[in-house]
């Protein structure tokens, strides 16, 4: 009796596609980049200042077993330094992807973002910190989306996925500038999805709740972390692995009919 079905590997739904994942040297972005690579995509690992971390992610992906479905020249993953709030650097990031993989970009996941670990009230938020938050979180999402809208492959498979936050719904004190910067992105993506009519490119936001990353823990006491965990129906904060399956679904063909949506993934936190 043939044992082919028991030893055959599962199909790779993103084989032959190129994905840029911003802010993917660590945290949720890192987990997303690895997951999309596991689904067959070739990946741009983007970072701003953590070069060694980005190289480790790319090395991990490039060490994946060879699969014949993954076609195209070059490595499975490359590393590109780019500040998403700088237009020329965003353009260069797309240029690098097209050059390295000799193919158009199919998927943009914008995971780059910052959060002020001082958690100031709006009254105590400095103008400089406010501007910096919006520069990265909002302007960065805008610039990446703008470039993607003009350069992603059209006719099917084009995906723009922007990470926002469940803070736009929980409205916790101390997150004023951060939540506002993410809420702006959520409004923008709803309009973007309509403007992309006829291209076959979808645009959505994924809005995680509290996720156990370096950015989440920064500035929080153990007592505060426990309090946040207790607010979840699961009694814990989320992990990056709780977010990546949704991003993988949206990036694939099965997610085509999901468009212009803000999708919370927070375990019932909000």
Curated annotation (Swiss-Prot):
**Predominant localisation class:** plastid
Q: Where is the transit peptide?
A: 1-53
Instruction: Give the GO molecular function terms.
Output: oxidoreductase activity, acting on CH-OH group of donors
Write out the similarity annotation.
Belongs to the short-chain dehydrogenases/reductases (SDR) family.
| Protein origin, superkingdom | Eukaryota
Query: Can you say what this protein is called?
Result: NADPH-dependent aldehyde reductase-like protein, chloroplastic
Chain residues that bind NADP(+): 26-50
Q: Which organism is it from?
A: Arabidopsis thaliana (Mouse-ear cress)
* Binding sites annotated in the UniProt record for substrate: 165
- The active-site annotation reads 178 (proton acceptor)
Functional summary from the UniProt entry: Aldehyde reductase that catalyzes the reduction of the aldehyde carbonyl groups on saturated and alpha,beta-unsaturated aldehydes with more than 5 carbons.
Tell me the classification of the organism that encodes this protein.
Eukaryota, Viridiplantae, Streptophyta, Embryophyta, Tracheophyta
Q: Quote the subcellular location field of this record.
A: Plastid, Chloroplast
Q: Which UniProt keywords apply?
A: Chloroplast, NADP, Oxidoreductase, Plastid, Transit peptide
Which Gene Ontology terms of cellular component type are present? chloroplast
Which Enzyme Commission number(s) are listed? 1.1.1.-
Query: What Pfam families does the record point to?
Result: adh_short_C2
């Amino acid at each position: 009796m043939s044992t082919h079905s028991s030893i055959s590997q599962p199909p790779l739904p993103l084989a032959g596609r190129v994905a840029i994942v911003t802010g993917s040297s660590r945290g949720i972005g890192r987990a997303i980049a690895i997951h999309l690579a596991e689904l067959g995509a070739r990946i741009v690992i983007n970072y701003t200042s953590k070069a060694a971390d980005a190289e480790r992610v790319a090395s991990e992906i490039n060490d994946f077993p060879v699969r014949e479905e993954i076609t195209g020249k070059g490595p499975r993953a490359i590393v590109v330094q780019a500040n998403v709030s700088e237009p020329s650097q965003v353009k260069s990031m797309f240029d690098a992807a097209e050059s390295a993989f000799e193919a158009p970009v199919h998927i943009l996941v914008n995971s780059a973002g910052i959060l002020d670990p001082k958690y100031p009230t709006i009254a105590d938020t400095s103008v400089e910190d406010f501007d910096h938050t919006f520069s990265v979180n909002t302007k960065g999402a805008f610039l990446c989306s703008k470039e993607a809208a003009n350069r992603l492959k059209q006719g099917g498979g084009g995906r723009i996925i922007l990470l926002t936050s469940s803070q736009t719904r929980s409205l916790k004190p101390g997150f004023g500038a951060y939540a506002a910067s993410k809420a702006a992105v959520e409004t923008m993506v709803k309009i973007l999805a309509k403007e992309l009519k006829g291209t076959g490119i979808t645009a959505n936001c994924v809005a995680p709740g509290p996720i156990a990353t370096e950015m989440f823990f920064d500035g929080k006491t153990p007592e505060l972390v426990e309090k946040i965990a207790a607010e979840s129906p699961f009694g814990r904060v989320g992990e990056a692995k709780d977010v990546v399956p949704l991003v993988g679904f949206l990036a694939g063909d099965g997610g085509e009919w999901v468009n212009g949506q803000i999708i919370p993934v927070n375990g019932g936190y909000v």
